Amino acid sequence: TLDTGANRDATWQYFGAPGKNVSFTVDYITWLYQWHEKQNWVKQNGTLTFEPFAGYAITQYGQPTYSLMADPIYTDQTIILTKTPENQGGMNGDNLFANSYMAPIDVKNFTPEDFTGDLEKTFYIFNSGSWNQWNGQNEKDSTLGGNGSTTPGQYCAIPALSAQYLDSEYDITTIPP
């Protein structure tokens, strides 16, 4: 859980860069974190260039709109999934990545062989939500881990071996235009 001191009703958006060469300046109303498997959530400050395919979380006061300009990515991307023996957050092996292509990634195209070593062969497709939603404050309304869960703050777990039997509802989507 990402607990930063921001209001616990703040809605977090999990996202990735919509391409390459995307710059962003973190202002005084924004909390921005990047996921690192070894360090967990790492706070981002100042002006930065988003790493394509890296996972980020953002929340802010109010509802500002951000415009991000990016160069499209047309090449294949290899993402190295890691499992550190121990880390400070106790969440070793949790890899979070985002789709930086301008088209969805169909989870049916992955096979168990795409997951190396003892990594869990499961996709977790998250729906953005608040800290309170993630910690069960709205538990009666949720279908935590259920197939097709669209409740904010919840996810859908898809075993890689089962992905070929699912419909396109379970694509890893791109950022909407």
Where are these regions (language model features)?
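A short, polar beta-strand/turn micro-motif
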Residues: 1-28, 43-122
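Hydrophobic beta-strand positions in blades of beta-propellers and related beta-sheet-rich domains
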Residues: 30-39, 123, 131
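Charged, amphipathic alpha-helical scaffolding segments
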Residues: 33-71, 149-177
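Long, internal scaffold/assembly segments composed of regular secondary structure
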Residues: 90-177
